[in-house]
């Protein structure tokens, strides 16, 4: 490389006699004289042995490094963190899950800005890795690529992690013996990779590919595969082109690119968490994405992927028929994607998809547009007097489109879960789990344990659940989350009392607490904000700085 442009940042760290101490330290980690003349590419690895989602990412980081080095740049691998949702679910530890998104983002910014990396490649596996990495890349706004760690293979008898959660409910209901629960526990997770359905990790990886920030089909590869290794090498080579042409996240992560991502995740039947995270990712790059965008795009976008949790197939089975590239080609040909959006290949979306073959005849995973699972979005944005600033539900229609029931109110996830397991929740109830929002939790925990218990008890079509917390991508049933304003801020969800009638109407997109305005005002006047649950440490700091879920639950908004 002769141009100084690809060394915009690293030259300040390593050039000139005054930087001899910097070069001396870098020589100790393997730099030679020629390396100081190359672009430096930080490789942000989320490797960790705390979860199978990330246990293999160290080897993927090495493959990325090979690609970077072979293309004439210098790779520098460093680590950031991960928190496993699946392991911490239903415990106090889950309060750190969404917080970890900010820690990942902040740490990528800190390391690559502090060390003068000219470009960055981030590799993620577990749910919060994806938005955390993208937010960090967007903040830095240096040539960047995201690499997905890949999906896990199915467990025995087509099981996955959600099978284990739902088996807990089935055991509590007396439908299966303890030996069957133990067998499912021991055979559902066969090795490395992210949770296998169209849960949060696979949803967000797909969204990032549609954004143009990962290589074609990066989101649809098994974690342990030659294709995933090649994806890493290809990303390492591609970053050099981005450096030479100064193509940055702000050139790729445009409003139209986010519209592409929203369109794709709706067709896939993706996780409600995508709403929160896409808003946050857009905010990091200075693009405004709101709940209204999900409504606008959702009105004209069908759900056509028969994938878990609402469907029957796993991501590994979608991979076998071609991944998401053929779906994106179908969407492009139907005029539903913006083909002129730039991507990390240096080509437009349309150019990347030009030669993609369609799915094989006879496959039943991706349905035709004229025979959708649902004719419009399953991600239903609700308003009404219970959620005047918005709430997010995932309703495919299998649960019905309207639910009216009487409230059973719980001020924590633990209380709600115990009540469900103990049989206190019955058909016709609306379970209200509150004070679990970004500030009130703090940390906006996912309610996979309660929703799985409801399904395992056989109440999936007879009980609704609403919360100011979140839902796992594996949650299913008549569920509404992200209720704003949250209870801790005095939102209407804080005013619900046991026995109140609540109506959730997906067609009118309203969630209504069926009491008079006068009664609502009276309850509001009596309400008092509870004391914060934490006064020091990470969760306390997070609660003081985090924004509303309707604006992405970000922590760096100007005060």
Swiss-Prot record:
Pathway: Amino-acid biosynthesis; L-isoleucine biosynthesis; L-isoleucine from 2-oxobutanoate: step 3/4; Amino-acid biosynthesis; L-valine biosynthesis; L-valine from pyruvate: step 3/4
InterPro entries per UniProt: DHAD_IlvD/Edd, Dihydro-acid_dehy_C, DihydroxyA_deHydtase, DiOHA_6PGluconate_deHydtase_CS, ILV_EDD_C, ILV_EDD_N, IlvD/EDD_N
GO molecular function, one term: 2 iron, 2 sulfur cluster binding
Signal peptide interval: none
Cofactor(s) needed for function: [2Fe-2S] cluster; Mg(2+)
Any Pfam family: ILV_EDD_C
One GO term of the biological process aspect: isoleucine biosynthetic process
Positions of post-translational N6-carboxylysine modification: 128
Active site residues of this protein: 472
EC number: 4.2.1.9
Catalytic activity: (2R)-2,3-dihydroxy-3-methylbutanoate = 3-methyl-2-oxobutanoate + H2O; (2R,3R)-2,3-dihydroxy-3-methylpentanoate = (S)-3-methyl-2-oxopentanoate + H2O
Chain positions recorded as [2Fe-2S] cluster binding sites: 53, 126, 195
First-level EC class: lyase
Function: Functions in the biosynthesis of branched-chain amino acids. Catalyzes the dehydration of (2R,3R)-2,3-dihydroxy-3-methylpentanoate (2,3-dihydroxy-3-methylvalerate) into 2-oxo-3-methylpentanoate (2-oxo-3-methylvalerate) and of (2R)-2,3-dihydroxy-3-methylbutanoate (2,3-dihydroxyisovalerate) into 2-oxo-3-methylbutanoate (2-oxoisovalerate), the penultimate precursor to L-isoleucine and L-valine, respectively.
Subunit field text: Homodimer.
Family according to the record: Belongs to the IlvD/Edd family.
Name recorded for this polypeptide: Dihydroxy-acid dehydratase 2
Taxonomic lineage from the root: Bacteria, Pseudomonadati, Pseudomonadota, Gammaproteobacteria, Alteromonadales
